[in-house]
Amino acid sequence: MSEEKKDYSCTLNLPKTDFPMRGNLPTKEPETLKAVFENGLYEKILKKNEGHKHFVLHDGPPYANGEIHAGHALNKILKDTIVRYKAMKGFYAPFIPGYDTHGMPTEKKAIEKLGLDRSKIPVTKFRDTCREFTTNYKDIQTEGFKRLGVLGDWAHPYITYDHATEARQIGVFGDMYKKGYIYKGLKPVYWCTDCETALAEAEIEYKDVTGESIYVKFPVEDSKGLFDKKDTYVVIWTTTPWTLPGNMGITIGADYEYSMVELKENKEDSKLERLIIATELVEKVMKLAEVEDYKTVQTFKGSELEGVLCKHPFLDRMSRVVLGSETTVNVTLDEGTGAVHTAPAYGKEDYLQGLKDKLGMVVAVDDKGKQTAEAGEFAGQFYAKSNKTITAWLDENGYLLKAVKIEHSYPHCWRCKKPIIFRATPQWFASVDGFRDDVLKAIKTVTWHPDWGEDRMSEMIKGRNDWCISRQRTWGVPLPIFYCKDCGEPYVTEESIKKIQDVVRTEGTNAWWAKEAKDLVPEGAKCPKCGCTEFKKETDIMDVWFDSGSTHQSVLVERGLDYPADLYLEGNDQYRGWFQSSLLTSVAVNGIAPYKEVLCCGFVVDGQGRKMSKSLGNGVSPIDVSNKFGADILRLWALSSDYSMDVNLSDDILKGISDVYRKIRNTARYILGNTYDYDPEKPVAYEDLQEIDKWALTRLNKLIKDCTKDYDTYSFGNCYHDVNQFCVVDMSSFYLDIIKDRLYTEKADSVARRAAQTTMYYILDALVKILTPMISFTAEEIWSAMNHTEKENVESPMLADYPVSNDEWDNKEIAEKWEKIIKVKNIVAKDLELARAEKTIGNSLDAKVTIYAEGEEYKFLKENEELIKLVLIVSGLEIQENNRKQEEKLGVKVEHATGEKCERCWMYNDHLEDGLCPRCKEVLEK
């Protein structure tokens, strides 16, 4: 019988750790949430940084009418990452989560879900129901955000229905009114006939629809002596026949040429017809109208036709020909006839044209979208239906030249998804013209990410209408306006605003509906116009964008936070939403932008790039993801993305992220397992570290610098890739693999082993802090498994300082030298792999490698032979001059190592004694 081999495993320093290989995040994270995050961590972080420089990221409030979705998750994870990083850098960084609660969506859902008839219950009861509804979803969303690891003052969020928030908002309105920026006017606004309210620009979305464009003949009644008016028509073109009852004029281009085209005799009534059309469009229109026999009998310059009167086809009034301009109706020759149907009640440009030329205004559609008596025989018809009936009437009565099917982009309500209309109604407006130049200047003071955001916002402000701030709803902040009972004059004073603020601060805005006007106006209030002392209240509420757009005052100033905020971060749709409404109110009230920086993100789409929607059934719930993969996987997904663009999300993508997570986790686990007996209070001095350790610290130093820059510039995708590269390439595939022999086989308390442990500890300590803003749950788990110095013996890495680079570790000479060594390793690795495939060796320790080189290359290899052997993890290495392989820069030969395999370290040696190589024998004897 052969002699039984001894078991030397008990003499090795094998890894020991309770840190599991598998994260089991869905189970572990809720435990961490309860034990750490919900145990006063946020307050402890603020206390640690008290008195330090502030950093305020102001939270754009999500609408509290449903559970959190993937877009919410992306947004809040980005915010949480920034705030965590800033706090670890020592900033006093409070985060006050917000909730948007007022307005139409909540009203609609409350009515649908609870079966309410709004007209049959008191306003205050209806408002209380809306409040209960939105409070429920606010609580649901709060739990959702906390599950994602988002830290903040969840016990004291700001909610747009809070009394103090509402009172401050009323103050913002009062300040703008005092400065003359608020006025009441009859102007066209976006109007949803289903919701029966005006809409903001940010509340509309465009969809492609198929409709009918019509070419309509307006008979000339007064030609100003330019031509014979008999049987002569000006032809207009419109895609909205329902607006024809509002037609008050026909706009043409002053500098265009117009032709009077005579058609051949009409067979039915044997009369000649003459049509006036822009010369450039005659051929196109005639072809569309299927008219082949025609001739031009007269031409005019557009300016000559100004003042010509045409009879409205079906109403008893005239339509005057007027001249367009760049600031009113801008007539083009791309489509139509060069003569634009102008209805001042139904469009911004038409309205401005009407003002310029005193055309007057007729609003022939009511709140519900039905034509009124002003529409003549079409009264009572829903506007969309009247498109067909008006077109049919025009055809039957000889006024329709042609109807053509077209596909065009049309505005829809973002809530009910139904088409909307432009319609003039009496509304309250904020006059953007009053402070537009100041807003444009303020935009230039802001740092925009991406930088094209500055141009985008500037162009929007340059072209935007006055802001319609009134809404015909009840769930919201009331417009704090009284009207004189006798003469109807609006009554708004500093005293009335203050009185309403005082009432709202204690009783909330329900008081506006619960109390009589006499109990809300200041004592001694009199109408400035007629002296009457009796008033009635405005019934409209403020646009919800005024709610959230005022939070720089109602939250930042009200709570004593920094104003302007350091950062606003929202989706790229908020250029026309919250970014803009906040900018307008802030400049109007204080003359400054409400933010120093603006960062925007894209939308979340599915794996195929499609928008997530209920109809497609492709929505992804962040809570479902957290319960299946873990919130840290969702956090890594968000931070790995190019969030400035739309971000794809699917199970396959999350599985890929999980693979990266496992590599990061296993790097941490390896280090934890090999530092179980290391005391961080007793590090090995830098000069006593081995050269490969010093190289590892150069890589760590680079990681710290790169990730610091990445976090500072919000380049989270770069940070994710830097960490992944460091863990996989620098650590797992190189450094940690190479030092395994030293860790396992050297004497436990030897300088060599302690040097490796010191280096690994520095690496893990920095790595866990870099990871804390990213994968906060896992970082807490790693932190609790680590040994710590007394100085950093804190319960959470969030209470530690973010790592800083160490100048001593910046060893350029070592970095350059090891870059060459790594190149050698990569060349030899291919030959080792080939030998393994050919069964020459089992693993690299079975190998003896010979490298052939010459000149400086040979000299470098010879000088660093021991280091190269260490890096290759082989039992034997020879460096020989010349005889290299022709096809490669280095010649490499791999053969099986000679001697016998040491039973302890597994290296081959020619001088084994009792199964041990001389090195292992020496270690055991010590």
Show where each model-derived region lies.
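Protease-associated
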Residues: P245, G249, Y256-T342, K348
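Secondary-structure capping and boundary motifs in well-ordered enzyme cores
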Residues: N49, K53-D59, G71-L74, L78, ...
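Short functional micro-motifs and their immediate structural scaffolds
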Residues: A200, I421, V492, E534-K536, ...
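Alpha-helical recognition segments enriched in aromatics with Gly/Pro capping
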Residues: D357-G369, R473-W475, E494-D646
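Cys/His-coordinated zinc-binding microdomains
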Residues: E196, Q472, G488, G531-C532, ...
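N-terminal catalytic cores of NTP/NDP-binding nucleotidyl/phosphoryl-transfer enzymes
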Residues: K47-K109, T160, I236-T238, W242-L244, ...
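Acidic, turn-prone loop/beta-hairpin segments
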Residues: D100, V189, T193, A200-K207, ...
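Residue patterns forming the tRNA-binding/recognition surfaces of aminoacyl-tRNA synthetases
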Residues: S2-D18, R22-L25, E31, A35-N39, ...
